[in-house]
Amino acid sequence: MNPLAQPIIYSTIFAGTLITASSSHWFLTWVGLEMNMLAFIPVLTKKMNPRSTEAAIKYFLVQATASMILMMAILSNNLLSGQWTMANITNQYSSTMMLMALAMKLGMAPFHFWVPEVTQGTTLMSGLLLLTWQKLAPISIMYQIFPVVNVNILLAFSILSIMVGSWGGLNQTQLRKILAYSSITHVGWMMAVLPYNPDITIFNLIIYIVLTTTAFLALNLNSSTTTLLLSRSWNKLTWLLPLIPSTLLSLGGLPPLTGFLPKWLVIEELTKNGTLIIPTAMAIITLINLYFYMRLIYSTSITLLPTSNNVKMKWQFENTKPTFLLPTLMTLTTLLLPIAPLTFPTP
């Protein structure tokens, strides 16, 4: 990518998300989504190879299809109500079409098939943007239209996303695909609580962004894209090795780490609203998600090499520049739940 084009591309991505999140007019919302989509395609093809080109084409086709469905829903609602504002959605069919389009953009099941493939086909940092920043615009629309969304369909999408995200990551050895399936699971948790308490959805999104950013930055610092490369990271950056397991466990939602806090709030909110079976099923299914993170940790830090003679030891480690971002994120990843009683005092 041309260095002169990078500020323009990233500014357009930021502007598109900002326009969508701050607009109450459907046309401006759709324009912001299109700006965001078109500007993100060069980010996916930062490294020109057949795999990144394939990922960019898949991303474009899925997002264009979702935008077309969303525009059809907007126009049908306008024909029936005569309004362009997001608060005036009177047709149930239009709201269902909007929900399907936004679920496709978010990568929720059963529209999730593009997320692992696109994430695998791009770089780690581009995958980080795909799984974090690109969620903001669709979730901001969902936040505004949730009063008219069919709750049963949204809960079905959420539970299916948690199931697919948990089962899909079991047989993966590519770390980007594992994080992509983890993203599908987290989106399912966010959307499950949206009709009952949208503020918990926003809090869940913030925690998810912190956890995913920490994981991607740690893997990028190690240049680890597979479980095999991650298991050899002890010979590259020894100081990072003890921190990766805590990050992965927090991403899987193990108490008392930070990743359990949003799940705790979601389960509490759903239980208050009389849906005891749904949060119980969600918690049980998410244990599968925690299992393949435990498997990653086992292959990374618990197992020892059978013989040290077969491994080339580095006599000089890489001189990495010190950064305050990763240690700060690591602290938030592990210590936010223990201070939660101070942050969320009980009445």
From Swiss-Prot:
<feature type="transmembrane region" description="Helical">
    <location>
        <begin position="178"/>
        <end position="198"/>
    </location>
</feature>
<keyword id="KW-0812">Transmembrane</keyword>
<feature type="transmembrane region" description="Helical">
    <location>
        <begin position="55"/>
        <end position="75"/>
    </location>
</feature>
<dbReference type="GO" id="GO:0006120">
    <property type="term" value="P:mitochondrial electron transport, NADH to ubiquinone"/>
</dbReference>
<keyword id="KW-0496">Mitochondrion</keyword>
<dbReference type="GO" id="GO:0032981">
    <property type="term" value="P:mitochondrial respiratory chain complex I assembly"/>
</dbReference>
<dbReference type="InterPro" id="IPR010933">
    <property type="entry name" value="NADH_DH_su2_C"/>
</dbReference>
<feature type="transmembrane region" description="Helical">
    <location>
        <begin position="96"/>
        <end position="116"/>
    </location>
</feature>
<keyword id="KW-1133">Transmembrane helix</keyword>
<feature type="transmembrane region" description="Helical">
    <location>
        <begin position="274"/>
        <end position="294"/>
    </location>
</feature>
<keyword id="KW-0520">NAD</keyword>
<dbReference type="GO" id="GO:0008137">
    <property type="term" value="F:NADH dehydrogenase (ubiquinone) activity"/>
</dbReference>
<protein>
    <recommendedName>
        <fullName>NADH-ubiquinone oxidoreductase chain 2</fullName>
        <ecNumber>7.1.1.2</ecNumber>
    </recommendedName>
</protein>
<feature type="transmembrane region" description="Helical">
    <location>
        <begin position="200"/>
        <end position="220"/>
    </location>
</feature>
<dbReference type="Pfam" id="PF00361">
    <property type="entry name" value="Proton_antipo_M"/>
</dbReference>
<comment type="function">
    <text>Core subunit of the mitochondrial membrane respiratory chain NADH dehydrogenase (Complex I) which catalyzes electron transfer from NADH through the respiratory chain, using ubiquinone as an electron acceptor. Essential for the catalytic activity and assembly of complex I.</text>
</comment>
<dbReference type="Pfam" id="PF06444">
    <property type="entry name" value="NADH_dehy_S2_C"/>
</dbReference>
<comment type="similarity">
    <text>Belongs to the complex I subunit 2 family.</text>
</comment>
<feature type="transmembrane region" description="Helical">
    <location>
        <begin position="123"/>
        <end position="143"/>
    </location>
</feature>
<keyword id="KW-0999">Mitochondrion inner membrane</keyword>
<dbReference type="InterPro" id="IPR050175">
    <property type="entry name" value="Complex_I_Subunit_2"/>
</dbReference>
<dbReference type="GO" id="GO:0005743">
    <property type="term" value="C:mitochondrial inner membrane"/>
</dbReference>
<feature type="transmembrane region" description="Helical">
    <location>
        <begin position="237"/>
        <end position="257"/>
    </location>
</feature>
<dbReference type="InterPro" id="IPR001750">
    <property type="entry name" value="ND/Mrp_TM"/>
</dbReference>
<feature type="transmembrane region" description="Helical">
    <location>
        <begin position="145"/>
        <end position="165"/>
    </location>
</feature>
<keyword id="KW-0472">Membrane</keyword>
<feature type="transmembrane region" description="Helical">
    <location>
        <begin position="324"/>
        <end position="344"/>
    </location>
</feature>
<feature type="transmembrane region" description="Helical">
    <location>
        <begin position="25"/>
        <end position="45"/>
    </location>
</feature>
<comment type="subunit">
    <text>Core subunit of respiratory chain NADH dehydrogenase (Complex I) which is composed of 45 different subunits. Interacts with TMEM242.</text>
</comment>
<keyword id="KW-0679">Respiratory chain</keyword>
<keyword id="KW-0813">Transport</keyword>
<keyword id="KW-0830">Ubiquinone</keyword>
<keyword id="KW-1278">Translocase</keyword>
<dbReference type="InterPro" id="IPR003917">
    <property type="entry name" value="NADH_UbQ_OxRdtase_chain2"/>
</dbReference>
<feature type="transmembrane region" description="Helical">
    <location>
        <begin position="1"/>
        <end position="21"/>
    </location>
</feature>
<keyword id="KW-0249">Electron transport</keyword>
